[in-house]
Amino acid sequence: MGRAIGAIEGLPVLDLGRRVADELGTSPDLALVAVPEADYRRVEARVACQVLDHAVAQGAVVALGSGCLGDPRIGLRLEELRLVHDRSYQIVALACATRVLATRNGLDAPRSVALGTVHHQFVQMLHERQARCQDLADVVIDTTSTTPDEAGKKVM
């Protein structure tokens, strides 16, 4: 969705997941398992602050992802940006039906006992992150049945 908004607005897109992976010397698909999670989150928080600063200085769409909001400094930074810049920045939270997100993340094997605990943990994590995202958001967009381009147009 960030790419869709960037294309509409003519702005570059700063993807936190990609930048963290680059910093760790791996691909975005493997970054979270390539290093211990605490190391990943530490790098993620530092890089999130950098991309937010870059967006303020030069203009950009920033795709943060919900994981970085586990660090309270990121939420505070987003609130500061909103206050200092008189709401010229819009914080968008993406929501999606749990079943659809499970499918998108490969947790949809039919009647798999092995995935039961993983699915339960996923749902708990999802609810915690959705609450954090929605608390910070100016707009919540449901992506359950939309493409990234359609979701981007809803924001605009």
Identify the function of each model-found stretch.
Residues 13, 60, 89-92:
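Hydrophobic beta-strand scaffold residues
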Residues 4-5, 28-30, 75-79, 106-110, ...:
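Short, glycine/charged-enriched secondary-structure capping and boundary segments
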Residues 4, 8, 90, 130-156:
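NTP-dependent small-molecule kinase module
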Residues 7-16:
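Post-Walker A helix-loop "phosphate-sensing" segment adjacent to the P-loop in P-loop NTPases
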Residues 18-80:
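ATP-dependent small-molecule kinase phosphotransfer cores
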Residues 39-46, 124, 128-135:
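A non-catalytic, amphipathic alpha-helix used as a structural packing/dimerization or gating element
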